[in-house]
Curated annotation (Swiss-Prot):
Its EC number is 5.6.1.7. Forms a cylinder of 14 subunits composed of two heptameric rings stacked back-to-back. Interacts with the co-chaperonin GroES. PANTHER family: 60 KDA HEAT SHOCK PROTEIN, MITOCHONDRIAL. It comes from Clostridium beijerinckii (strain ATCC 51743 / NCIMB 8052) (Clostridium acetobutylicum). It comes from the Bacteria. This is Chaperonin GroEL. Keywords: ATP-binding, Chaperone, Cytoplasm, Isomerase, Nucleotide-binding.
């Protein structure tokens, strides 16, 4: 297929138009007085949201060069969302600022490769300084503040803090839609591991692409199942009992998987298969954890057990199991409570004995899954549109809270970026174009405060100067229009979110500046519809 080409300044400017279109749409949502964006949906009601990554994902531009620019910045939002779960609007805004300042200098003749070196130096220094001013999360109150700022709702903050208190920092918190108007917290004991179904055809809810099994049997084995004959005796017993089955195995493939999928599609029998979590010896231990929790037996060769000999009383059971593409949650396993306590004490003893930090971390995870549980936040609202918007905000708040527990918190409202400007500005380079790269980051670090102020209807430059000349930690509270100590006032951002947003924005933006040519498909011309043929009655009146 023939291609269109653009070079140099022409290519970069076309792509920058796309960057600006996407970033200008996203950045109106930043801060406590940020607005919402309405997204048209092919099916159902429009979605109203202020979630940066949800907005970015919806944007496709007609012009291929503009679209390239938009897709590059979309990657900034997506990557930040994947790493930190929040901060996508800030990341998009920073990328736009770095690209804008960078292009001015590249157009004036600066070398983009040297500019990129300067950008990297400045970002590394900024991240180092952000980590220095970071404060560890201290108790329930700090958690509530982080969540409340992210969701712009104090009630949500309290709810997430309660959830984390009940299941622990390593516990599992899921968000579901409620059938009532209110938002409430429901804590159920359960275990989650990061393995999803082996085939999407096993999903029972095709809209959410999840498989939900109520009161199922659970077959736990470290073997690979490829021949259906191996598990046929126990399958026949389960079909007669009318229950569903979850298989946790090393792998399930070939004829065995095909048979299970076909039976599921025909409605004969519902079975979901997932791969066993972990690797090596850790996998054996995790399978034993699941067996203890559900009251089942691990079918393993080293224990002298074969699949063909499995009977129903060797299977585990639970109130419910939810399996998505990536995760499995077992809720209310029917294992013996004394056996579970014994297993928990065993893991605690191993934690005390081990000297390896990695092993300790993995043991803590296992302990949380056995002893913690699953907290479910049920989101309610008057309309479906409000419900979806609220759910997105709570998802962001939960991700922000987890990030805060991981790496700590810094002053919010863009204040942390302004606080590190002086240290970053001290960086110098003998190479003029590298120094330009450093200066670009120094200027771009002001952008989040400027945009929060603009969205609140005040002049950003005035706010930035005031914050720069104040003590570190003093920032602008856009909601109340006053200067306060941000951490004491509860306006905080997770360090991980603040750091990731800057790193991802700089990574994509500095690569963007080195672009010298752009190649795109020539749009296909629409062929006009042929005219209707004559009726064979020419000349008649």
């Amino acid at each position: 297929m023939a291609k269109m080409l653009k070079f140099g300044e022409d290519a970069r400017r076309s792509m920058q138009i796309g960057v600006d279109k996407l970033a200008d749409t996203v950045k109106v949502t930043l801060g406590p007085k940020g607005r919402n964006v309405v997204l048209d949906k092919k099916f159902g009601a429009p979605l109203i949201t202020n979630d940066g990554v949800s907005i970015a994902r919806e944007i496709e531009l007609e012009d291929p060069y503009e679209n390239m620019g938009a897709q590059l910045v979309k990657e900034v939002a997506t990557k930040t969302n994947d790493v930190a779960g929040d901060g996508t609007t800030t990341a998009t805004l920073l990328a736009q600022a770095i690209i804008r300042e960078g292009l001015k200098n590249v157009t004036a003749g600066a070398n983009p490769i040297l500019i990129r070196t300067g950008i990297k130096m400045a970002v590394d220094k900024a991240v180092e300084e952000i980590q220095k001013i970071s404060k560890q999360v201290d108790g329930k109150e700090d958690i509530a503040r982080v969540a409340a700022i992210s969701a712009a709702d104090e009630e949500v903050g309290k709810l997430i803090a309660d959830a984390m208190e009940k299941v622990g920092n390593e516990g599992v918190i899921t968000i579901e839609e409620s059938k009532s108007m209110g938002t409430e917290l429901d804590v159920v004991e359960g275990m989650q591991f990061d393995r999803g179904y082996v085939s999407p055809y096993m999903a029972t809810d095709t809209e959410k692409m999840e498989a939900v099994l109520e009161n199922p049997y659970i077959l736990i084995t470290d073997k690979k199942i490829s021949n259906i004959q191996e598990i046929l005796p126990v399958l026949e017993q389960i079909v007669q009992s009318g229950k569903k089955l979850l298989i946790i195995a090393e792998d399930i493939e070939g004829e065995a998987m095909a048979t299970l999928v076909v039976n599921k599609l025909r409605g004969t029998f519902t079975c979901v298969a997932v791969k066993a979590p972990g690797f090596g010896d850790r996998r054996k231990e995790m399978l034993q954890d699941i067996a203890t929790l559900t009251g089942g037996t691990v079918i393993a060769e080293e224990l002298g057990r074969e699949l063909k000999d499995v009977t129903i009383d060797m299977l585990g059971t639970a109130d419910s199991v939810k399996v998505s593409k990536e995760n499995t949650v077992i809720v209310n396993g029917k294992g013996d409570s004394n056996a579970i306590k014994e297993r928990i004490n065993q893991i605690k003893a191993q934690i005390e004995e081990t000297s390896s930090e990695f092993d300790k971390e993995k043991l803590q995870e296992r302990l949380a899954k056995l002893a913690g549980g699953v907290a479910v936040i049920k989101v309610g609202a008057a309309t479906e549109t409000e419900l979806k918007e609220k759910k997105l905000r709570i998802e962001d708040a939960l991700a922000a809270t987890k990030a805060a527990v991981e790496e700590g918190i810094v002053a919010g409202g863009g204040t942390a970026y302004v606080n590190v400007i002086n240290e970053v500005a001290k960086l110098t380079s003998d190479v003029a174009d590298t120094q330009i790269g450093i200066n670009i980051i120094v200027k771009s670090l002001e952008e989040p405060v400027r945009q929060i102020a603009t969205n609140a209807g005040v002049e950003g430059s005035v706010i930035i100067e005031k914050v720069k000349n104040s003590e570190p930690g003093i920032g602008y509270d856009a909601l109340h229009g006053e200067y306060i100590n941000m951490i004491k006032g509860g306006i905080v951002d997770p360090t991980k979110v603040t750091r990731s947003a800057l790193q991802n924005a700089a990574s994509v933006a500095s690569t963007f500046l080195t672009t010298e040519a752009a190649v795109a498909d020539i749009p296909a011309k629409e062929t006009p519809m042929p005219g209707a043929p004559g009726m064979g009655m020419d000349g008649m009146y």
